[in-house]
Amino acid sequence: MDISTDNPDHGFQFPGTFELSAMGAAERGLETELPRLLAATGVELLQESVSWKHSSSGKYVSVKIGFRAESREQFDAAHQALRDHPEVKWTL
């Protein structure tokens, strides 16, 4: 199947700045581990864009990470690294 658009300005543009979020158990240290994991994929981590928030019960943490990717392949590798982490319940 060929997917195309009538407006080439829609969709991801590379190189570009992006943000991914991941949620998992709060006691697993994901706040520090996930940014390191993304950096290891070769994307440029934007330290000022790394943030996290604990759930109201304190059981879970949502980690938001900003980064710069030079290509779709880099973006996909970064997203896959988060999805592959055994403590990550979901990504966005």
From Swiss-Prot:
InterPro entries: UPF0250_YbeD-like (IPR007454), YbeD-like_sf (IPR027471)
Family membership: Belongs to the UPF0250 family.
Cited NCBIfam families: PRK00907.1
Name this polypeptide is given: UPF0250 protein XOO4915
One Pfam family hit: DUF493
